[in-house]
A protein has these predicted regions:
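Short pre-active-site segment immediately N-terminal to redox-active cysteine/selenocysteine motifs
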Residues: 10-13
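General structural signal for secondary-structure boundaries
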Residues: 1, 53, 74-76, 195-198
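C-terminal cap of thioredoxin/glutaredoxin-like
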Residues: 21-29, 113-212
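Structural alpha/beta surface segment adjacent to cysteine/selenocysteine redox centers
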Residues: 19-119
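Short, cysteine/histidine-rich loop/knuckle motifs that typically chelate Zn2+
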Residues: 16
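A generic fold-level signal
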Residues: 1, 90, 170-171
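Extreme N-terminal starter segment of soluble prokaryotic enzymes
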Residues: 2-7
């Protein structure tokens, strides 16, 4: 039977995924490498071309306040406040896919770093240069990262992630799936945000059952 693992369907520019990032940290602390996490990009708004209106910015800022109230995480709307900002989630998602070539753990760390850059630091993570800066922070070589990020192969791989999400019936983010059990079946741990204690309880119960 394949090693039990988690599949995390997420998007770097999904505010509730940012809110869920401390939960993933708790999962890593609780289970370590006995329960590895594979990150799959869900595709929140890939290919968006129209700049945000001021009304849309206000609406999304309201959603961010809900996440902040629920999680206590910091928010800075500077990344979205720029004139002509296009909320295209594909560049950041593709960056995570490129980093994933270096390993799942690094991809997960890069996802978290990108979320923090956008939501807490107000940086424009639709920019390849910003995404490269973040990759360099984690030890990647800048030119190689940008070359891979701009490649047709990376674009195609990212859209395959979106297709996997759709095929799996994932309709919202974050979604966390665990599997396989003794019958080879995968099950949903949470659809949408859930507090750490709830998620850890579900996972501990699941791990105990498949180990029995």
């Amino acid at each position: 039977m394949p090693t039990p693992h988690l599949i995390y369907f997420a998007d770097p520019m999904c505010s509730w995924c940012y809110g869920f990032s401390p939960v993933l940290d708790d999962i890593r602390r609780a289970f370590g490498r006995t329960l590895p996490v594979r990150v799959v990009m869900g595709g929140l708004r890939p290919g968006t071309e129209t700049p945000m209106t001021e009304a849309a910015k206000l609406e999304i800022a309201g959603h961010w306040r809900h996440v902040q109230d629920a999680t206590g995480l910091p928010f800075d709307a500077g990344g979205m406040a720029r004139d002509g900002f296009v909320y295209d989630t594909d560049p950041a998602a593709r960056a995570v896919v490129v980093v994933r070539h270096e390993g799942e753990e690094l991809a997960s760390s890069y996802l978290t770093r990108t979320q923090r850059a956008f939501y807490a630091e107000g940086r424009d993570v639709t920019s390849g240069e910003v995404l490269a800066d973040l990759a360099v922070e984690l030890g990647l070589e800048r030119t190689r990262f940008l070359t891979e990020w701009a490649s047709e192969e990376a674009k195609a791989e990212t859209w395959r992630d979106y297709a996997i999400s759709q095929h799996a019936g994932v309709a919202g983010f974050p979604t966390l799936v665990a599997g396989p059990n003794e019958e080879g079946v995968y099950g949903v741990v949470t659809r949408g945000f859930a507090p750490p204690a709830q998620v850890l309880e579900v996972l501990k119960d699941w791990m105990a059952r498949i180990a029995a």
